[in-house]
UniProtKB/Swiss-Prot annotation:
Species this chain originates from: Mesocricetus auratus (Golden hamster)
Descriptive protein name: Cytochrome P450 2A9
Superkingdom to which the source organism belongs: Eukaryota
Designated gene of the protein: CYP2A9
Localization terms from the record: Endoplasmic reticulum membrane; Microsome membrane
Function description: Cytochromes P450 are a group of heme-thiolate monooxygenases. In liver microsomes, this enzyme is involved in an NADPH-dependent electron transport pathway. It oxidizes a variety of structurally unrelated compounds, including steroids, fatty acids, and xenobiotics.
Length: 493
């Protein structure tokens, strides 16, 4: 009895301290935007639908406007909803909002290192180098285009071997797309049966799913406690160590055969730059940043494109009249006697519009990647202290009725003008906007066009059930949306 009483007293004392700390912090938060009243320590957790955070935020924006504050646990997050608010922050005040916000799942691995999850001078140095080096290795140019064409040709060969039988396209696409970025980062591609490669893809996929899940959200809010408790987060923590160890091995392989006068891949280029910068005390070029930047590129270059293509298949089967028009444009512009080239897109406005609409409608990461203020900032009359987390809701731009007709419906005409030509839309920002837009956007655009057109040049898509049975709605999963698994057939043309 005495022991139980002491435990109860300890718990009550702990909660009391948390409440006092919470109240004390509110006095020093600056003049943050309004929002729902938070509870001590747990914040607004009980007011959010943890299975569909995006919908909860949309509802809150209708009540509090385009700029408001929610508390994820004890941590305040300023939410930017709609084109105007996001543009003002990420473009007009780009420097102030250029920091990377907190995401506990990914911070467990990256710990503020690497190009994607760092801030300040580190992020600037690594970003400049990464963009220049990716360009040197042909990203957005003919060099990487040829690698994509090679992988696309191998993918066609594998799909033909299925002989029209129903298959799950997920694994085929995931391995194919990942091998493109592998050739840039490592200098070569993996064998599709390589167990280490398959396990690597599995761990990255599990990490992304966990980060978006309700348990992942709890971990994001209360990671200081949950990292010591049993649960699925322990497997994720274990996986992060294995991912880091994998990349360390890759870096050591390159170090052992490095030629300072000839870079074979991204890792070599980074190692050479490390050598050149070794006497610079402010240099961010070190092994830790190399390992984490290489992992950043591998993450970014693997899952998003393959998921978008899988969702594209589902939509094209749901709307066969759209697939038919894409086939017609491919036949007219490219024909059947050569592989598609990226420059073909200039003569294929309808296909480009379809690809854009697939990305818009999928809206796979509606909350974007969190930002934070790198200095005390005034925004729309509110005072945001340095290191305030900010969520620019990119999904709110992709579904804005001011820019897209019937945004809840799939309609490639959103991206075509009255003459049937492709038009630019300011709110179409699937790769974010401003100083921290996705540095792999050029590669992703090239992959989406070449993989999709190459597949549709060779196959028609068939769903094994009736068209009305196709559920083409992305499934909300916490902070993101996922594509349901399904089977389909690729029928040779």
């Amino acid at each position: 009895m005495l022991g139980s009483g002491l435990i109860l007293v300890a718990i009550l004392a702990y909660l009391s301290v948390m409440v006092l700390v919470f109240v004390w912090k509110q006095k020093f938060r600056g003049k943050l935007p309004p929002g729902p009243t938070p509870l001590p320590y747990i914040g607004n957790y009980l007011q959010l639908n943890t299975k569909d955070i995006y919908s909860s935020i949309t509802e809150l924006s209708e009540r509090y406007g385009p700029v408001f504050t929610i508390y994820l646990g004890p941590r305040p997050v300023v939410v930017l909803y709609g084109y105007d608010a996001v543009k003002e922050a990420l473009v007009d005040q780009a420097e102030e909002f250029s920091g990377r916000g907190e995401q506990a799942t990914y911070n467990t691995l990256f710990k503020d290192y690497g190009v994607a999850f760092s801030s300040g001078e580190r992020a600037k140095q690594l970003r400049r180098f990464s963009i220049a080096t990716l360009r040197d290795f042909g990203v957005g140019k003919r060099g990487v285009e040829e690698r994509i064409q090679e992988e696309a040709a191998y993918l066609i060969k594998m799909l033909r071997s299925t002989r029209g039988a129903p298959i799950d396209p997920n694994d085929y696409l995931s391995q194919t797309v990942s091998n493109v970025i592998s050739s840039v980062v490592f200098g070569d591609a993996f064998d599709y049966e390589d167990k280490e490669f398959l396990e690597l893809l599995h761990m990255m996929n599990e990490m992304n799913k966990f980060a978006a899940s309700p348990v992942g959200q709890l971990y994001d809010m209360f990671h200081s406690v949950m990292k010591y408790l049993p649960g699925p987060q322990q497997q994720i923590i274990k996986n992060t160590k294995e991912l880091e160890d994998f990349m360390i091995r890759k870096v050591k392989q390159n170090q052992s055969t490095l030629d300072l006068n000839s870079a074979r891949n991204f890792i070599d280029s980074f190692l050479i730059h490390m050598h050149e910068e070794k006497k610079n005390p402010t240099s961010e070029f070190n092994i830790k940043n190399l390992v984490m930047t290489s992992l950043n590129l591998f993450f970014a270059g693997s899952e998003t494109v393959s998921s978008t293509i899988r969702y594209g298949f589902l939509l094209l089967m749901k709307y066969p009249e759209v697939e038919a028009k894409v086939h017609e444009e491919i036949d007219r512009v490219i024909g059947r006697n050569r592989q598609p080239q990226f420059e073909d897109r200039m003569k294929m406005p309808y296909t480009e519009a379809v690809i854009n609409e697939i990305q818009r409608f999928a809206n796979l990461a509606p909350l974007g990647i969190p930002r934070k203020t790198i200095k005390n900032t005034t925004f729309r009359g509110f005072f945001l202290p340095k290191d305030t987390d900010v969520y620019p809701i990119l999904g709110s731009l992709l579904t804005d009725p001011k820019f897209f007709t019937s945004p809840k419906h799939f309609n490639p005409q959103n991206f075509l003008d009255d003459r049937g030509q492709l038009k630019k839309i300011a709110a179409f920002v699937p790769f974010s906007v401003g100083k921290r837009f996705c540095l792999g956007d050029g590669l992703a655009r090239m992959e989406l066009f070449l993989f999709l057109t190459t597949i549709l040049q060779n196959f028609r898509l068939k769903f094994p059930k009736k068209l009305e049975d196709i559920d083409a709605s992305p499934k909300p999963l916490g902070f993101s949306r996922i594509i349901p698994r399904y089977t389909m057939s690729f029928l040779p043309i």
